[in-house]
Amino acid sequence: MYRIAIEKLLKWKQSKRRKHLIIEGARQVGKTWLMKEFGKQAYTETIYINFDSNSRMAELFASDLDTDRLIMGLELYAGHKIDPDNSLLIFDEVQEVPRALASLKYFYENTPQYHIVCAGSLLGIALHQGTSFPVGKVDFLKLYPLSFKEFLIATDKERFAELLDKQDFGMITCFKQTYIDSLKQYYFIGGMPEAVQSFAENKDFNEVREIQKHILAAYEQDFSKHAPNEIVPRLRRVWNSIPSQLAKENKKFIYGLVRDGARAKDYETAIMWLSDCGLVHKISRVNAAGIPLRANEDLKAFKLFVVDVGLLGCMAGLRQRTLLDGNALFVEFKGALTEQYVCQQLKTIEDLEVYYYTNDRGSCEVDFVVDTGEQIVPVEVKAEVNLRAKSLKTYQEKFSPEVSIRTSMSDYKKEEWLVNLPLYAIDQLKVVTDA
C-alpha cells in the first residue's frame, strides 16, 4: 500500500537539520505500518520496540537517561552494534513510557546521528497533558487515513491519481465517471488502511463495514481505558452525536443535541480529548478574512468532523446500496458525507489551515475558508452538480479574495472570480489557487 507520507519520511532522512521524529495520528491510521515500511525501504535494518508490550525496554528508560547507556541497552536488545547511518530505531506506543519520550531531548543533544522515529495511538493526549518532551528538539509528522488519491492508487487506479496531479482537466473530464464511481466507493469505505486493503483484495463491502465496526468498537474501548473516568460518559455522548450534528443544514456543533440542557463548560474537556487523540477535526468559525485567519477565530463556534468519512457512514448506519445507487430520501446526509470528505482531504494538504465562515447575523455561511499562507480561499461544498453559490458570492463581494472555490460533481471550470473544482480533485486546491 502506498502512502504519500513515505516521501516525507525520505526527505526527513536526508535533511541536514533532521531531529528525531514523532508521528501523530488516530488509532489504526497506519502509523506502525508506515514506520516499518520506511525502515524496509530506506535502511539496512530496523530495530522495533513496542513499549506497550516490551517491559524490558520500559525498564531501560526507568533510571537515568544517559544516551550512551541507552544506546548500549538498545544494542544488547538488537544483538549487535547499531550503525547510526543504516539503522532505524522505532519507538512505538511511546506514550506508555513517558521517559522514553523525554529521552528524545538527550538523543538530539548528545547522539543526533541516530535515526529515531516514534509513534503512539494516544500520543496526542500524552503530549497535551504535559508529558515531558523538548519542544524544538523533535520533528513532527501528522498521519491521517488514506486520502482519495491514495485510495485510487490502492485500488489499481494509479494512472488516474497521476492525472489529478497533472491537473489535465480536459482528460480528467473524459474519464469523470471513473472518478465519480471511485469517489462513491470512498465515501463508503473511507481511508482507514485495513478497510481499504480489504476492499482492494476482496471487493466486499460487507467485510469493509465489519472492519469499520471493529475500529469504532476499539475507539469506544479507548474511552474507557485511557480517558479520565469522569469524562467517559460525556465522550460517548459527544462522539455519538456527531452524525446528527452533521446532518443539520447548519453544521455548527450544538451542545443541546448532545443532551438536553448541555452547556459548553460540561463538554469542553471531552471535545478536547477527542481532538487530542485525533478522532475528530474541530473546525472553528471565523467572521473575517484577514491574514492570518487564526486572528479572526471564534473559539466558541465550531464544527466537529470525525477522522474518516467511512467511519461516519458506519456510525450513521448508512447502507451501501443507498450510497452507491442513490435514494430519493438520501439528501441531507449526503451533504454531511460530502462536507466530511472535503474536510478530510483539506486536512491532508500541507501547510493549510482550515476554518469555516459565517457573518455575525448568520445570514451567510461558507462551508470552509482556508489559509494557504499566501492567501485566504473560501470553499463552497456541493454534494451534486448544483452550481448555485449565493453565500460564496456574498463573501466574494465583501472580502474580494483572489479566487473562490466551489467544489461539486460538476466538471472543472474557471470563471472570472470562481473556480469549480470537482470533488475528486479537491486535493489540488493549493495548486489551482496559486496558478
Language-model segments: which ranges?
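Accessory nucleic acid-recognition modules appended to NTPase machines
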Residues: 200-365, 369-370
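Hydrophobic anchor at the beta1->P-loop junction of P-loop NTPases
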Residues: 23
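N-terminal pre-Walker A segment at the start of P-loop NTPase domains
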Residues: 1-14
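Conserved catalytic cores of phosphodiester-cleaving nucleases, focusing on short active-site segments
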Residues: 346, 366-385
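Short glycine-rich substrate-engagement loop in P-loop NTPases that contacts/grips substrate
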Residues: 53-85
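Interdomain motor-coupling "hinge/lid" segment immediately C-terminal to the ATP-binding subdomain
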Residues: 128-247
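Hydrophobic positions on the alpha1 helix immediately C-terminal to the Walker A/P-loop
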Residues: 34, 38
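Conserved lysine of the Walker
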Residues: 31
